[in-house]
């Protein structure tokens, strides 16, 4: 795989990092890319796809905490490989800097360029391993003080669990010591699940899937061996059980369709007691990736009704009910619903006492948007929208509106019930007792309700 250029742009289009490896693509590619992304309106889509071609140049990009990580090339390369490379470069830089934002990039541009020159040579990838790079990187990171950091959604998804973990968990460099030269011995394990659910217009589940990963980030000196135990009732493959029954709270076992492990993981006792053994490499890495298609109880139930209210009017009612326990809080919830193309105006009515909620009608793409700051488990929220049309509608209005889609983050909650039962670290001495942090988070990948 070969790329010509790599660069990082801010949300404003400012060029933060730029490296031209092969001099095959015009120097103005950064401006071409940003202009294309900012004003993308092809095929009715508001956002540019991760891959597109302009004047014979292929542009690949991923957006990480508000920054565009971009690669360009004129040759035909595997899109999935380039997108994975961009994600890994972002992860390596985050491992070294502790946090990804403009400030940390600008304070550490010498280190960032040193990393890029080791990761990619003349357009060819050499390594994306933080552990391997430590032997070749000699610049020390300038760690940005946590007080200077602005809250960023993807990096702050665990803040709801502050009582369980330190607030600086996601802002530490794996190579820089804490002030005073001492390094705090600790390890973080994150169980992150992205769920995809499609509801029928009657509220029944049509498709459901979980893409999960167990991420580990180690700040342990000496690379001690770690044993990580999962549910004893974990099964790989469906084992002939029905895939249409909800699992009860008592549990009938966790059934994964398939999974794969990091190369450092040893599976000697996995079949007998579901224990993983490994010596963690430096940096953040996925211990295990897994997929589950057995039907599960979705965290939110969405009911939507749209009906005519006159020749040029209609009313929409969207009701959301949280199906998780009351001690769990979901945050950064966004509900979107495409409206008929001839919608000219929308007025909204929220329930009495509604707080932390915003509504908007995006006229450019005829989109209804409802943002909620948080939803407590067991809570129910309703939005009413009155639509005004510029012309009479003919036929069934439900065929010209929807579906309703949701995005959300639920800290300290996972729908698959996969759990880390214990995290054991080989002791160097009787007084060695590093901090262990285990965190769970559920996010929406594709959460859609038809109307």
From Swiss-Prot:
One Pfam family it belongs to: Adap_comp_sub
CDD domains for this protein: AP-4_Mu4_Cterm (cd09253), AP4_Mu_N (cd14838)
Subcellular localization: Golgi apparatus, trans-Golgi network; Membrane, Coated pit
Domain of life: Eukaryota
UniProt KW keywords: Coated pit, Golgi apparatus, Membrane, Protein transport, Transport
GO BP: intracellular protein transport; vesicle-mediated transport
Subunit structure: Adaptor protein complex 4 (AP-4) is a heterotetramer composed of two large adaptins (epsilon-type subunit and beta-type subunit), a medium adaptin (mu-type subunit) and a small adaptin (sigma-type subunit).
Protein name per its UniProtKB record: AP-4 complex subunit mu
